[in-house]
């Protein structure tokens, strides 16, 4: 009887222990909402047989969810469109370091994380677009010049709560300092054509509708408009031209930000997750990104889509990308202080 009880107890304990057997899948927490991502995952599944499960939400919600889940989080990978959120997750201890020279060798060194917690997938620039009818290219020069009185009532941009604007402001804090950036923001707010609203596409549509003459937008949105199936969006895209700021001699270059991927600290399917990181780093996957989302490849040998190539090459701001995270709170403080809604 005692022997029976002993065996029963062993079996009961074993049944209650967590199942360590790795499943043939990966779980992604992703902020990205682009169709190209689904194409990438489908191609990866066909190639490897590994099922890709994706949970989508905004970055702050996903970060909080991983924090709450702790060691029991099912997430293997975190993907976001902003370095600031990648830095935040790494700083909170949610990620583990990723080290693979075979991946890093395919990436522009300027785009790499100095702390080793995330890998860039694509990048884009936050550019100025201008009306082909009401603005001459030679009127534009730098981000700093957007504070000039000549743009009063002519500048369109989305709200300060948007991560893209927060990243741009963070880069200005890094390059100019808080005092100069605050002065800049005050003057820029005074130049708004309307209170900030809508997304980047909406700023371009507003230019086409004559509600403003210039706008601050992410570069790839112009590609998305020009390749749209909607006539209104195509016409909006055609109504503007792209300008990369701060390109003159001795100037720092245009602000950039990345979409990136991070391996979670307690990834339950680590081997599979690493396989996906490596796949998204391949030339094939990078070409899929640029030809469908109109972003720039992190691989210098992968050319942009033809639409993007037409804008010409540009000089990138060489600032440490993690400063877009470390300066984020100061950027938000400046937004609030200067009335950028």
What are the functions of these language-model segments?
Residues 171, 176-245:
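Ligand-binding pocket segment of bilobal, Venus flytrap-like solute-binding proteins
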